[in-house]
């Protein structure tokens, strides 16, 4: 399983196109874990709309606000267990074959150098 990790903070203007781009991926075996850092705009409302449409999108909550993006990603890494991890920012836009191309390249490297190669 592929875990996509996203940290958000006041990303209302950007997050919808990013979520749509993730939903359009050619590989479907993924779960998106989102940790919001205390947004005061409509970011959580936009995320909730997508959660209702797709069970692969999860909002992971904790009681600490303003961890910052780097600490939010580290927090998610400690909470999520997966075969592969991908990181995305709220203002990214992924081409439809991003996951497919990434996994394909990683598989090639693992075959060449062994599975313990990061």
Language-model segments: residues:
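Nucleotide-sugar donor-binding/catalytic module of glycosyltransferases
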Residues: 1-118
């Amino acid at each position: 399983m592929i875990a996509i990790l996203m940290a958000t903070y006041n990303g209302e203007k950007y997050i919808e196109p990013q979520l749509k781009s993730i939903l359009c991926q050619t590989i479907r075996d993924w779960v998106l874990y989102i940790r919001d850092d205390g947004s005061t705009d409509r970011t959580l409302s936009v995320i909730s709309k997508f959660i209702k449409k797709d069970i692969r999108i999860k909002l992971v909550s904790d009681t600490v606000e303003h961890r910052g993006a780097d600490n939010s990603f580290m927090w998610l890494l400690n909470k999520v267990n997966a075969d592969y991890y991908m990181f995305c920012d709220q203002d990214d836009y992924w081409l439809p074959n991003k996951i497919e191309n990434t996994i394909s390249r990683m598989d090639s490297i693992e075959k060449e150098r062994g599975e313990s190669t990061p």
